[in-house]
C-alpha cells in the first residue's frame, strides 16, 4: 500500500515530513536569489548578506521542530525527518555555481498529490539539489507503491530572472519553474499561485503531469512574491482563511467564491534576527491543519486562535520563534503525505 495518499489540506493527518534547521544558511547572492527574494530590499545583489544563520537561531528552531514532531506523534501521526547534509557545499551546472540553502521547508520542494510525490523545479539555484535531503524517504515511499516524479530540471540561466521587473514578473517563462509551496490541494482542484516563485509554464507542466483527473487553477494577481500558504489557508470543506491584505473580491480564485471566508485578524509581529526578515508578519497564519477540527498555530497569535475557535477549529498552540528569520511557519516546515479520506470535488 502506498505510504503517500493525500487529497487536500484538511483530512485527518496520518503521516508527515518535518524539516530540519541543521546547517541552514543564506546562500551566496546570485541573480536568482536577488530577483526572487531581495530585489525590493537591496539595490544590488552584492549587498545581500550570505552565510550560516546564527547558532542560537538554529538550535532553538531545531528544538521547536522536535517539540512539533513529538506533539504530532502523540496524536498518532507518523513523523519523518530528513537526513543531514552539508548545505555549504558547492552546487554547479555548466551555467552557474552557488552553495546551498536549508532543509527547513520540505513544503517548498516536494508536492504530494494523491499517491504521487513530485520533486518541483524550484526557482532558486541554491535549492537545485534540495530533494537529496529526502532521498531515503522518497525511496521508501516509492517501494510502498507511491508514484515518484521529478519535474524537468530547469536550466535557471540568467535570462530566467528579471530583477528590475515589478514584483510578480521577475520569473520569466522560458521553462517550467515553480516551488511546490505555490500549490494548495482542494481535492480535484489545485490552486497554483503565479508569482516570483512559480511561472505559467510551471502550471502547464503540473497539469500535464497530473492528467485530466485534476484541474490546476493558475491564480494571477493574488500575491506577487513567493508561496501561497500565508495568503489562502483551507481549513475544511467550504471554509477558508484569507489574508485581507492580499485577497479581495477581484482576485479570489473562482472555484473558491462559493466558500465561506474567514478573514485573518491583525497578527502579532514576532520579530526577526538579522538585517532583514525572510518573510512578513503574515507568516503567523501559516498553520498546519491536523484534522478539520484541529490546527497547529503559533501560540503568540492569540487573535487568530480566537477566530479559529469561533469557527469550530481547536488549536494546538506551539511556536517557531524564528519563522520570520528562516522564512517558514508550521505549514512551510512540514509536508503532509498521507491523510485519511478519498478524492472529491468540493463545490458549494
Swiss-Prot record:
EC number: 2.1.4.2
Keyword Transferase applies: yes
Highest classification ranks of the organism: Bacteria, Bacillati, Actinomycetota, Actinomycetes, Kitasatosporales
GO BP of this protein: creatine biosynthetic process; streptomycin biosynthetic process
Reactions this protein catalyses: 1-amino-1-deoxy-scyllo-inositol 4-phosphate + L-arginine = 1-guanidino-1-deoxy-scyllo-inositol 4-phosphate + L-ornithine
Similarity-based family: Belongs to the amidinotransferase family.
Pathway membership: Antibiotic biosynthesis; streptomycin biosynthesis
Chain's gene name: strB1
Keywords: Antibiotic biosynthesis, Streptomycin biosynthesis, Transferase
Alphabetized GO MF terms: glycine amidinotransferase activity; scyllo-inosamine-4-phosphate amidinotransferase activity
Function as written in the Swiss-Prot or TrEMBL entry: Catalyzes two non-consecutive transamidination reactions. It converts scyllo-inosamine 4-phosphate into N-amidino-scyllo-inosamine 4-phosphate and N1-amidinostreptamine 6-phosphate into streptidine 6-phosphate.
Protein name: Inosamine-phosphate amidinotransferase 1
CDD domains attached to this UniProt entry: amidinotransferase_StrB1-like (cd21135)
Subunit structure: Homodimer.
Amino acid at each position: 500500500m502506498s505510504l503517500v495518499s493525500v487529497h487536500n489540506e484538511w483530512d485527518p493527518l496520518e503521516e508527515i515530513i518535518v524539516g530540519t534547521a541543521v546547517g541552514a544558511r543564506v546562500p551566496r547572492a546570485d541573480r536568482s536569489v536577488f530577483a526572487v527574494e531581495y530585489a525590493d530590499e537591496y539595490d544590488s545583489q552584492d549587498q545581500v548578506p550570505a552565510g550560516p544563520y546564527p547558532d542560537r537561531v538554529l538550535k532553538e528552531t531545531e528544538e521547536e521542530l522536535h517539540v512539533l514532531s513529538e506533539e504530532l506523534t502523540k496524536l498518532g501521526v507518523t513523523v519523518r525527518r530528513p537526513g543531514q547534509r552539508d548545505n555549504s557545499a558547492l552546487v554547479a551546472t555548466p551555467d552557474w555555481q552557488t552553495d546551498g540553502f536549508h532543509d527547513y521547508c520540505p513544503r517548498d520542494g516536494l508536492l504530494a498529490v494523491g499517491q504521487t510525490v513530485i520533486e518541483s523545479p524550484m526557482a532558486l539555484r541554491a535549492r537545485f539539489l534540495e530533494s537529496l535531503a529526502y532521498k531515503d524517504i522518497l525511496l521508501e515511499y516509492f517501494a510502498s507503491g507511491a508514484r515518484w516524479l521529478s519535474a524537468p530540471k530547469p536550466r535557471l540561466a540568467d535570462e530566467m530572472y528579471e530583477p528590475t521587473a515589478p514584483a510578480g514578473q521577475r520569473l520569466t517563462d522560458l521553462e517550467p519553474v515553480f516551488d511546490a509551496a505555490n500549490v494548495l490541494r482542494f481535492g480535484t482542484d489545485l490552486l497554483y499561485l503565479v508569482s516570483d516563485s512559480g511561472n505559467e509554464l510551471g502550471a502547464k507542466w503540473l497539469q500535464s503531469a497530473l492528467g485530466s483527473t485534476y484541474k490546476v487553477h493558475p491564480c494571477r494577481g493574488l500575491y506577487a512574491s513567493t508561496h501561497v500558504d500565508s495568503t489562502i489557508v483551507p481549513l475544511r470543506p467550504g471554509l477558508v482563511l484569507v489574508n485581507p491584505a492580499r485577497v479581495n473580491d477581484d482576485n479570489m480564485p473562482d472555484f473558491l467564491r462559493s466558500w465561506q471566508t474567514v478573514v485573518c485578524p491583525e497578527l502579532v509581529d514576532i520579530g526577526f534576527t538579522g538585517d532583514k526578515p525572510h518573510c512578513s508578519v503574515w507568516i503567523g497564519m501559516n498553520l498546519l491543519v491536523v484534522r478539520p477540527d484541529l490546527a497547529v498555530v503559533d501560540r503568540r497569535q492569540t487573535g487568530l486562535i480566537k477566530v479559529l475557535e469561533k469557527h469550530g477549529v481547536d488549536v494546538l498552540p506551539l511556536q517557531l520563534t524564528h519563522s520570520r528569520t528562516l522564512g517558514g511557519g508550521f505549514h512551510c516546515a512540514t509536508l503532509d503525505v498521507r491523510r485519511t479520506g478519498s478524492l472529491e470535488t468540493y463545490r458549494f
